[in-house]
């Protein structure tokens, strides 16, 4: 029976557009990774845009997200979700990206790119991402550079 571990990554985006890099420093080609949930919780009043945020995940071989040359055209996007109005401030909308297991080294060997876009008129957007890692046999399910959080669905 494969072991499993869930990582929850929380963040806050207060700028117009922000790119975040999550380093999978102990990637295991014999394991499977699955994005199980992404949730955005707006903390301000929405603008006239039709969305609160966008998440796009993929592997970028060429451009660092901190570079001004970074664009989604450089990404291989394999998961995408848009949070739309109306979502009252403080109420979270969640998405479960189910049955999407990644064990292709070319797609997932090095980095997971998390892109959140704040269209809240300068307001903060709180988000968290849950990554479930299935290990094979007794291989430790550890991703060294990810901070682990206790998942509280009421937050």
Sequence positions of predicted segments:
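C-terminal interaction-tip segments
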Residues: 1-16, 30, 44, 119-155
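Noncatalytic modules at the cell exterior or secretory-pathway interfaces
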Residues: 31-40, 104-122
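Extended, solvent-exposed segments with strong compositional bias
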Residues: 4, 61-107
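Solvent-exposed, conformationally flexible loop/turn segments
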Residues: 12-19, 90-95
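Short secondary-structure capping micro-motifs at structural edges
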Residues: 22-26, 98-102, 113-117
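Ser/Thr- (and often Asn-) enriched beta-sheet segments in non-cytosolic proteins
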Residues: 6-8, 54-56, 96, 113
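Beta-rich globular "head" domains
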Residues: 5, 17-70, 75-77, 128-132
